[in-house]
Amino acid sequence: MENLHGKTVLITGASSGIGAALAREFARRGASLILLARNRQRLEAVRDSCAACGAGAIRLVEADTTDFAAIDAFAPTVEGCLDYLVLNAGISQRSLAVETGEAVDRRVMEVDFFAPVRLTKALYAAGKWDRHTHIAATSSISGLFGFPQRSAYCAAKHALKGFFEALQLEMDMKVTLLFPGRINTPISLSALEADGSAHGKMDPGQAGGMDADACARKCVRGILRGKRQVRVGGKEMISCFIYKWFPGIFFKFAGKASAV
């Protein structure tokens, strides 16, 4: 296992799901962590599990990534230059495109696209990362092609992919885009319905999905190997192959499948 003692990793959305699992995976390698999320109590639980895994120094930051004033104030407080910036915070959606309110479309774009972009720019302006920093951003299999009842989510995750690929080319730096499929996390609980209310239940796809820790192991392994993309999940990942090589089949049957 790679030794990351002396390295600093900032992870957003670190209080649960893939973010918490990524934090533990970096902790096992001895990295120092800056864990950012809205829920202080959950962050403290993740901190304790990371400490037990062998993490170096751990800093907790209770903040909403869409509160740009708070993000701008936070950025200069980061000590030194980050070795890894992991942009993982996100929200999903569960509604038909034509029934989804514009406020929901904007909220999903705000959380899944504009927030990570703003944090990235704020940290750069504060001198907290440079071209030697490795950035990882959590997109989704839905960021590779469309899925039903995920129109805003797909749009945001596609935008995230485009932005960070462009940044990689401009800065000549390492960027890894993470494309998880169905992972057993609580993301569907907070997913937005057409009217903006919370979905409030676990989808079968999530409930039966890959364990978050197993997902994180593959993601961190890919990050440390310098991969540009890490695609991780179960049998649903065959959709990537079908979309690329048999698009006619994909568009005929994908609408009938349960979305990710």
Regions found by a protein language model. Name each.
Residues 53-68:
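Rossmann-fold cofactor-recognition segment
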Residues 31-45:
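Conserved glycine-rich Rossmann-like NAD(P)H-binding loop of the short-chain dehydrogenase/reductase
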Residues 15-16:
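Conserved glycine-rich cofactor-binding loop
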Residues 172-234:
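SDR active-site lid
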Residues 140:
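Residue(s) in the substrate-gating loop at a strand-loop-helix junction
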Residues 96-107:
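Substrate-binding pocket helix/loop in short-chain dehydrogenase/reductase
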Residues 120, 156:
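Active-site helix of classical SDR
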